[in-house]
From Swiss-Prot:
Subcellular location per the Swiss-Prot or TrEMBL entry: Virion; Host nucleus; Host early endosome; Host Golgi apparatus
Any single Pfam family the record assigns to this protein: Late_protein_L2
Keyword Glycoprotein among record annotations: no
Taxonomic lineage from the root: Viruses, Monodnaviria, Shotokuvirae, Cossaviricota, Papovaviricetes
Chief subcellular location: virion
Complex formation: Interacts with major capsid protein L1. Interacts with E2; this interaction inhibits E2 transcriptional activity but not the DNA replication function E2. Interacts with host GADD45GIP1. Interacts with host HSPA8; this interaction is required for L2 nuclear translocation. Interacts with host importins KPNB2 and KPNB3. Forms a complex with importin alpha2-beta1 heterodimers via interaction with the importin alpha2 adapter. Interacts with host DYNLT1; this interaction is essential for virus intracellular transport during entry.
Protein name: Minor capsid protein L2
Gene Ontology molecular function: any one: DNA binding
Biological role stated in the UniProt entry: Minor protein of the capsid that localizes along the inner surface of the virion, within the central cavities beneath the L1 pentamers. Plays a role in capsid stabilization through interaction with the major capsid protein L1. Once the virion enters the host cell, L2 escorts the genomic DNA into the nucleus by promoting escape from the endosomal compartments and traffic through the host Golgi network.
Cysteine pairs bridged by disulfides in the record: 19-25
Keywords, ordered alphabetically: Capsid protein, Cytoplasmic inwards viral transport, Disulfide bond, DNA-binding, Host endosome, Host Golgi apparatus, Host nucleus, Host-virus interaction, Late protein, Microtubular inwards viral transport, Phosphoprotein, Viral penetration into host nucleus, Virion, Virus entry into host cell
Length: 533
């Protein structure tokens, strides 16, 4: 006969949890959990009236509580092991009164208009030198309505007097501040054409100084030559001499801790050199079509090779793979991406070889880690464009061919030419004239081209030829819808008058086709509008 298994009885807390909601709890369980027994009520109500704290009951110290042990019929008790209290007399505090007030003597202000005379008085000691009288007279400048600040004297009788005279008109402190706000919707681009010798706006200014060029004028005397001074040219920093420092962009958006935890198990499986063979693949088919490196097969464009692939082989047949690195590979895992210590992206696939096959059909082979590192992808380089670019960035001045320096002083005449004119006054000399600055070159625009349009649209070019005609004004129109270009030319030629007939011309108008008479206007009837009453 099988012995009945002993079932553990439920605790009071478990019974209370099940019966409290249904309201079927026994009285003993309910009183024990809610602490409503007779003993609980005695402790609850008795603790409110009696306090036994601080007596040391049950502590094991034997101190007798806060008041100590008190023998029967005697006075207050003595605490066992207590340190006696030493009574000291009280210390009387010393009173600290206010500090002594030092009087300040008021000195009468000195009148600036009165003379200052200092007289030396006789001392009690015997003077060996004769008595001297020192008189110092000061004659101040007479002033009217001058504000005099009263001096302030600090110190006692034995200290020297210090006069602090304030400036009647202190300098006014000014402060200039400038605030500039950037408005992205309003931009002003200010550029000027750089001129060599006037502004260093251009980055490259090359000046070739040789034997060419003309120098007109110069110094008037030898004293002026000695007064001339050569200044050393200083190199100003270029306006484009700045460097753009770009921050290093983040390599990944995954936090470092999470990435390390997720790749720790993967690294142990891929980079264990004792259990996994490391093979670096150089064929680019490894990234998109790795199955073509294992065996010859037809491509299926609808099949994505992003999953684990299993290759079945015949035991008796020997098939040479397209790539010798994938020999005897029967399983090739899905691609995984990682980062190398050099910062490159690595594509990895974990494969397994079936090198040995037993009689039972089990395949034995090593695990292989196929990987390929991707090359660096450089960021796109954006060509920087200049704001307000003009064609004066590079200025080349060649002295023998293009430079001409003219130094003419129009305020003072040359000493070599004074006396050759009728008058020696500076106003009457022809050299003191602004006409010397005018250019005498005559421009000829014959055979030039006229271009109409702007840079955005296609331009139209018209050639203005120069031809001879007996007429005073000639018109040359190249296009019907274009512009009329008039090129006036005057020549001393005889005007040709064509002969005309003296017989007057009679014009006959016919209103109707085929009519042979002319009806007088008075014979035509006019229609009148009738008035209805």
């Amino acid at each position: 006969m099988a012995r009945a298994r002993r079932v553990k009885r439920a605790s009071v807390t478990d019974i209370y949890r099940g019966c409290k909601q249904a309201g079927t709890c026994p009285p003993d369980v309910l009183n024990k959990v809610e602490q409503t027994t007779i003993a609980d009520k005695i402790l609850k109500y008795g603790s409110a009236a009696v306090f036994f704290g601080g007596l040391g009951i049950g502590t094991g110290r034997g101190s007798g509580g806060a008041t100590g042990y008190v023998p029967l019929g005697e006075g207050p008790g003595v605490r066992v092991g207590g340190t006696p209290t030493i009574v000291r007399p009280g210390v009387t505090p010393e009173l600290i009164g206010p500090a002594d007030v030092i009087p300040i003597d008021t000195v009468t202000p000195i009148d600036p208009a009165a003379p200052s005379i200092v007289t030396i008085t006789d001392s009690s000691a015997v003077d060996l030198l004769p008595e001297l009288e020192t008189i110092a007279e000061i004659h101040p400048v007479p002033t009217d309505n001058v504000d005099i600040d009263t001096p302030v004297v600090t110190g006692g009788r034995d200290s020297s007097a210090i006069l602090e005279v304030a400036d009647p008109s202190p300098p006014v402190r000014t402060r200039v501040s400038r605030t500039q706000y950037h408005n992205p919707s309003f931009q002003i681009i200010t550029e000027s054409t750089p001129l060599s010798g006037e502004s260093a706006l251009a980055d490259h200014v090359i000046v070739f100084e040789g034997s060419g060029g003309q120098n007109i004028g110069g110094s008037r005397s030898a004293a002026l030559d000695a007064a001339q001074e050569s200044f050393e040219m200083q190199t100003w920093p270029s306006r484009y001499s700045f460097e753009i420092q770009e921050g290093t962009p983040p390599r990944s958006s995954t936090p470092v801790q999470r990435a390390v935890q997720s790749l720790s198990s993967l690294r142990r499986a891929l980079y264990n050199r004792r259990l996994t063979e490391q093979v670096a693949v150089t064929d680019p088919l490894f990234l998109g079509r790795p199955s073509r490196l294992v065996q010859f097969q037809f491509d299926n464009p609808t099949f994505e090779e992003e999953v684990t692939q299993t290759f079945e082989r015949d035991v008796e047949a020997f098939e040479e793979p397209p790539d010798r690195q994938f020999l005897d590979v029967v399983r090739l895992g899905r691609p995984t991406y990682s980062e190398t210590p050099q910062g490159y992206v690595r594509v990895s696939r974990l494969g397994r070889r079936a090198t040995i096959r037993t009689r039972s059909g089990a395949q034995v082979g090593a695990q292989v880690h196929f990987y390929r590192d991707l090359s660096t992808i450089d960021s796109e380089a954006l060509e920087m464009q200049l704001l307000g670019e003009h064609s004066g960035d590079s200025t080349i001045v060649q002295a023998p061919m293009e430079s001409s320096f003219i130094d003419i002083n129009i305020d003072e005449p040359d000493s070599l030419h004074v006396g050759l004119q009728d008058s020696t006054e500076a106003d009457d000399i022809d050299y003191n004239s602004a006409d010397l600055l005018l250019e005498d070159n005559i421009e000829d625009f014959s055979g030039s081209h006229l271009v109409f349009g702007n840079t955005r649209r296609s331009t139209t070019t018209y050639t203005v030829p120069r031809f001879e005609s007996p007429r005073n004004t000639g018109f040359y129109i190249q296009d019907v819808h274009g512009y009329n270009v008039a090129y006036p030319e005057s020549r001393d030629t005889t005007e040709i008058i064509l002969p005309q007939s003296d017989t007057p011309t009679v014009v006959i108008n016919f209103e109707e086709a085929g009519g042979d008479y002319y009806l007088h206007p008075s014979l035509k009837t006019r229609k009148r509008k009738r008035k209805y009453l």
